[in-house]
């Protein structure tokens, strides 16, 4: 289940981190990420929770049908890196994405700082008060890593 959650989340991220867009697709992507975060923490602790699992699957439908990418240029580099890692390991698809996503996002952070700031504030509820944009963005990625660890990454 956890590998699938990482795959779903990265499908959303790779459509979301596409520039400094401020459109309906971004708002939907943020809501989907929040839903996946919320529901995944419940489902991992109680795999029998039908509501949590069904919300994850509903989010997966949106993540995979590319409606949230309309009007955007998208970046599927995390998936490409994950597939490349597949040549050297038999890890599941989602776990490969988990392994490469944070290093990749940290690498591209300077090029998409405004979007990573928005991600930190809107998705991870980072308090921006008294912090630089760089600090806010890095805190968002740190919170993403903390969530991944809670899922037993």
Locate predicted features.
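Phosphate/diphosphate-binding glycine-rich loops and adjacent basic-rich segments that engage nucleotide
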Residues: 1
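Conserved FAD-binding catalytic core of PHBH/FMO-like flavoproteins
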Residues: 4-6
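Conserved phosphate-interacting/catalytic interface
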Residues: 9
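Conserved core segment of the aminotransferase class I/II
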Residues: 12
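Active-site segments that bind and position negatively charged phosphate/pyrophosphate groups
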Residues: 15-142
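Short, intrinsically disordered, charge-balanced linker/junction segments flanking boundaries
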Residues: 146-153
């Amino acid at each position: 289940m956890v590998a699938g959650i990482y795959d779903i989340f990265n499908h959303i991220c790779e459509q979301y981190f596409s520039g400094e867009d401020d459109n309906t697709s971004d708002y939907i992507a943020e809501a989907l990420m929040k839903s996946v975060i919320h529901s995944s923490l419940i489902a991992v602790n109680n795999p029998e929770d039908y509501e949590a699992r069904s919300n994850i699957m509903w989010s997966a439908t949106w993540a995979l049908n590319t409606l949230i990418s309309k009007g955007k240029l998208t970046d599927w580099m995390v998936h490409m890196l994950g597939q490349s890692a597949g040549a050297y390991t038999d890890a599941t698809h989602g776990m490969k994405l988990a392994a490469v996503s944070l290093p990749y996002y940290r690498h591209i952070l300077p090029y998409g700082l405004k979007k990573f700031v928005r991600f930190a504030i809107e998705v991870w509820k980072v308090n921006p008060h008294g912090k630089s944009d760089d600090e806010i963005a890095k805190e968002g990625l740190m919170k993403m890593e903390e969530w991944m660890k809670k899922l037993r990454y």
